[in-house]
């Protein structure tokens, strides 16, 4: 069996790791970086770009660049590029394909299986969407695990003592906090809470809004309508946020940000850490609510926490760390890289599934309560939040009207009392119920949550034995046929990318040969015969003409022809230079010919001195 990789599919950056010799190792991408921007771009020529290359071209191509797609997982959001609509699953699959290809290049073998992490507070539809993205990318998703749990695995894999840890995970677009108990190989999640709409992007947005307001005050120009300027502001805001984690102030300088009747306008501002803290104070406070909730759900006090683990790039923000320090009374642990720890934990879970890691038991929880709608639009909970998974729970319900022969089961996820205020996971009908007065039929509704946190629901009429089952795929989910179509589409694009890369290599080789031929002709000067030089010149021009077209076979053929004539001439000249009697221009000429002594040469007298006699 091949290696199972661990993937942290992030909002801003993604990371892939693998278990090697019992150790979790981060796999660098083809560009040499340990994390890959979760950015997908589409060039004007239709080429698909993923990662750093996509991020680099975002300023000049904002309309065809997709960022932070993770925020739309599990929704019916679509990205329109040219005439095609892309789902969040398809865009995420492009990022996963890049990570898969990087892992294959590193390992030197095909990769078909992965453990992918999701925010602990992801709903069922968001988890299902992540699994679908893996399938589209050509990966069998062996397990979906929560990001804080993965971080705890990476932190606690070699810790022998029992301890209670709090994982504070502030990523690019999501926030989670989980409390776990570690000991004797058991990683048990006691409680989890979070906010799927809060992350580093929101901190960037605060800086962007401040820059726009300040610039408008100075110049009267509102930059919001300029997409290219907005992309530059976004990059500058992210850079400023990162810099303010290490310095007390940073300069934001964006020349030629726009132009007015007075000429080009430049943005030049200084943002202090104090001002940044003021701008983002409400966001920091928003992370503390779920932190307090998780402690309350786990029935713990701040003093009961032994270690605080920080995860996600935005957890480096000094105000964030100060808020945690103040509330929990503990210095956050900084012995792990917050950008890589989740992928490393996923790789450990992959090792558990692959049999490489023994003695580890992971007991995760469901982040939100699950239930069904009952009479009066009430949400009746079957599985409360923070229930350890996998789990199964059943409850018996009855009909609301006389002679009712079918019921609709409306499956819900959330903490609100009214069904309308929670998230709908799905609906299905159980029909064939024997007519009877209301309250008589007995309908057993059963919920199963698997280890991936994905929900399966069944309803059974106890009198007739009629049963209906569904695996929840939310109304925004993809059908099996859609996933298969997207898999084929992704494979086709992968083949197109491979062909495009091959074409680039063929053209590069041809360009290199043209350059080599021109250099050879220049270096040889008058040493080569005119006929030989004409041959090279002719072959070179034919290749240059072929390069103007798109026939790759023709380019290869002409490259080979030019290579042959250049090689033949080089060989011919080398043989001439090496031959006995060759002139002074030969590489080693003169040794075999008549060695006539020049009359003007005077032989020098010399005396051999015995070194031994000189020693005293």
Curated annotation (Swiss-Prot):
UniProt KW Acetylation keyword: no
Listed HAMAP family: DnaK
Species: Heliobacterium modesticaldum (strain ATCC 51547 / Ice1)
Keywords attached to this entry: ATP-binding, Chaperone, Nucleotide-binding, Phosphoprotein, Stress response
Family as reported in the entry's similarity comment: Belongs to the heat shock protein 70 family.
InterPro entries membership: ATPase_NBD, Chaperone_DnaK, Heat_shock_70_CS, HSP70_C_sf, HSP70_peptide-bd_sf, Hsp_70_fam
Family annotation (Pfam families): HSP70
Induction field: By stress conditions e.g. heat shock.
Region described as Disordered: spans on this chain: 576-616
GO MF term (any one): ATP binding
Protein role: Acts as a chaperone.
Compositional bias annotation for Gly residues: 583-593
Gene3D superfamilies tied to this protein: 1.20.1270.10, 3.30.420.40, Actin, Chain A, domain 4, Substrate Binding Domain Of DNAk, Chain A, domain 1
rRNA-binding recorded as keyword: no
Name of protein: Chaperone protein DnaK
Residue positions, PTM Phosphothreonine: 174
Source superkingdom: Bacteria
């Amino acid at each position: 069996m091949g290696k199972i990789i661990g993937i942290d599919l992030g909002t801003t950056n993604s990371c892939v790791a693998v278990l090697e010799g019992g150790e979790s190792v981060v796999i660098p991408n083809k560009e040499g970086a340990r994390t890959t921007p979760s950015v997908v771009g589409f060039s004007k020529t239709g080429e698909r770009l993923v990662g750093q290359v996509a991020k680099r071209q975002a300023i000049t191509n904002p309309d065809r660049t997709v960022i932070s797609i993770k925020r739309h997982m599990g929704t019916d959001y679509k990205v329109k590029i040219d005439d095609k609509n892309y789902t969040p699953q398809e865009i995420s699959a492009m990022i996963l394909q890049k990570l898969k290809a990087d892992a294959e290049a590193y390992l030197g073998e095909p990769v078909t299986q992965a453990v992918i992490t999701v925010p602990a507070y992801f709903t069922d539809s968001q988890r299902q969407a992540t699994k679908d993205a893996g399938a589209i990318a050509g990966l069998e998703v062996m397990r979906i695990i929560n990001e804080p749990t993965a971080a705890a695995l990476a932190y606690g894999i070699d810790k022998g003592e029992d301890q209670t840890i709090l994982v504070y995970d502030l990523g690019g677009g999501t926030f989670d906090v989980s409390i776990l108990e570690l000991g004797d190989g058991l990683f048990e999640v006691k409680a989890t809470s979070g906010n799927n709409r809060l992350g580093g992007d929101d901190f960037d947005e605060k800086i962007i809004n401040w820059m726009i307001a300040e610039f408008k005050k100075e110049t009267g120009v509102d930059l919001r309508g300029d997409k290219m300027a907005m992309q530059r502001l976004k990059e500058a805001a992210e850079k400023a946020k990162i810099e303010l984690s290490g310095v007390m102030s940073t300069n934001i300088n964006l020349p030629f940000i726009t132009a007015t009747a007075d000429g080009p306008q430049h943005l030049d501002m200084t943002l202090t850490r104090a001002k940044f803290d003021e701008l983002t104070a409400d966001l920091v406070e928003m992370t503390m609510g779920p932190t307090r909730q998780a402690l309350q759900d786990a029935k713990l006090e701040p003093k009961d926490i032994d270690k605080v683990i920080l995860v996600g790039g935005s957890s480096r923000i000094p105000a964030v760390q100060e808020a945690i320090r103040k509330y929990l009374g503990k210095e956050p642990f900084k012995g792990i890289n917050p950008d890589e720890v989740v992928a490393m934990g996923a790789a450990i879970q992959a090792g558990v599934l692959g049999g490489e890691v023994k003695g580890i038991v992971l007991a995760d929880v469901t982040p939100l309560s699950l239930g069904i709608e009952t009479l009066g639009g009430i949400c009746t909970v079957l599985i409360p939040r923070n229930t350890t998974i996998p789990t199964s729970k059943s409850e018996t319900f009855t009909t609301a009207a006389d002679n009712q022969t079918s019921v609709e089961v409306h499956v819900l996820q959330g903490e609100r009392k009214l069904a309308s205020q929670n998230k709908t996971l799905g609906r299905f009908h159980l029909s064939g119920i024997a007519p009877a007065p209301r309250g008589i039929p007995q309908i057993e509704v059963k919920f199963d949550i698997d280890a991936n946190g994905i929900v399966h629901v069944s309803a059974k009429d106890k009198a007739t034995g009629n049963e209906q089952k569904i695996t929840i795929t939310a109304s925004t989910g993809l059908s099996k046929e859609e996933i298969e179509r997207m898999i084929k589409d992704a494979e086709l694009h992968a083949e197109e990318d491979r062909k495009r890369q091959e074409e680039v290599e063929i053209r590069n080789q041809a360009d290199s040969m043209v350059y080599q031929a021109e250099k050879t002709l220049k270096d040889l000067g008058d040493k080569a015969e005119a006929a030989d030089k004409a041959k090279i010149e002719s072959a070179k021009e034919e290749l240059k003409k072929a390069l103007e077209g798109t026939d790759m076979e023709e380019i290869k053929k002409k490259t080979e022809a030019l290579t042959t004539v250049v090689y033949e001439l080089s060989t011919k000249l080398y043989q001439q230079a090496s031959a006995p009697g060759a002139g002074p221009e030969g590489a080693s000429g003169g040794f075999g010919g008549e060695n006539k002594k020049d009359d003007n040469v005077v032989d020098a007298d010399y005396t051999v001195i015995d070194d031994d006699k000189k020693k005293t």
